[in-house]
């Protein structure tokens, strides 16, 4: 190490700052930089900065590609790890350079998370000498793991040369025939519960896998959530919730709101599968880049809030449209009215493009407040709906009839357990109480 590299351990600095700290001339500074092969220069004119590379396990540069909607992989950028720990310099295919204090915000959704992320973490931990608790992985651990993960990331990202080569040489997947779907799904669910990584790296806590299957509208890439066979009240409740999720998506679509296309399949032993078409896939090989509200707000909003609050702040920066803000208010209000207690920033996403970002179809919209808790306890009565003054009157008025229709449909569905149908019969009265509050709001 030298005095120059010691200074750069804390992060990028300009040439004038470095010369002043080292008390040297421009000529001496140029010679020092030329001798340090780990010192890199980026930026232009007065924005020029110097940084210190921080190779990780011998890797200094990580190439990234992105698959387009036709299935072609295009070079997106090179990522170089730098000091301080976790920082990186991203050089785009067009030569544009950007400094990030952590993972680039548009890649943060690739960090392993949820049910599949934990399976991935356990699988790679021993191989890479990492902790099997993915929450403790550092930024460079994540990037390195992404380069060796032999699977597919959501949104068509390819991190590392190996993944690029695998994509180029991959065979087209064979679809699961409709008449064999349940048999295949039962086996895939068993594999997933045993810790196998089946398909892409989708997040979320509900057990799931991804696959390529025949559907009534053609062959599709699908994300499949599932329950264990319904032998207990807990597994039965999870089955109720997956069926309710499909009902919610259908009602939103019928109401003119873009939501996932989904189908429920039930085996003879009451194992429930919710099959949803992946909205980051187009055709057989095409992919569409997506990014969560969580990732977007981490980059552009200093004080995150609810979906409507975050969307308004993004709209002020012209990152989303007023129409998207209004639609999100309706979605949020509908979620409140159907008792969705899990509307965190990872459950609303956008297609990644030049701003304004367009919303993806609504997903993970279900009455999660009725999910079994960690002790296996179940709610058996309707809860009070939380009123939110951050939602406009017009949004409430749009969402209320949709939510009433949702609960009425759940109450009539013979696939739903008697206990949950009873809750569904009670919920319209709770919504009427919200309707009274909305009536007192100004226009």
UniProtKB/Swiss-Prot annotation:
<keyword id="KW-0808">Transferase</keyword>
<feature type="active site" description="Proton acceptor">
    <location>
        <position position="342"/>
    </location>
</feature>
<dbReference type="GO" id="GO:0004674">
    <property type="term" value="F:protein serine/threonine kinase activity"/>
</dbReference>
<dbReference type="GO" id="GO:0090729">
    <property type="term" value="F:toxin activity"/>
</dbReference>
<dbReference type="Pfam" id="PF07804">
    <property type="entry name" value="HipA_C"/>
</dbReference>
<keyword id="KW-0238">DNA-binding</keyword>
<dbReference type="InterPro" id="IPR052028">
    <property type="entry name" value="HipA_Ser/Thr_kinase"/>
</dbReference>
<keyword id="KW-0418">Kinase</keyword>
<keyword id="KW-0800">Toxin</keyword>
<dbReference type="GO" id="GO:0003677">
    <property type="term" value="F:DNA binding"/>
</dbReference>
<comment type="function">
    <text>Toxic when overexpressed in E.coli, leading to long filamentous cells. The toxic effect is neutralized by non-cognate antitoxin HipB. Does not seem to inhibit DNA, RNA or protein synthesis, and unlike paralogous toxin HipA its toxic activity is not counteracted by overexpression of GltX. Binds DNA. Might be a protein kinase.</text>
</comment>
<protein>
    <recommendedName>
        <fullName>Toxin YjjJ</fullName>
        <ecNumber>2.-.-.-</ecNumber>
    </recommendedName>
</protein>
<comment type="similarity">
    <text>Belongs to the HipA Ser/Thr kinase family.</text>
</comment>
<dbReference type="InterPro" id="IPR012893">
    <property type="entry name" value="HipA-like_C"/>
</dbReference>
<dbReference type="GO" id="GO:0005829">
    <property type="term" value="C:cytosol"/>
</dbReference>
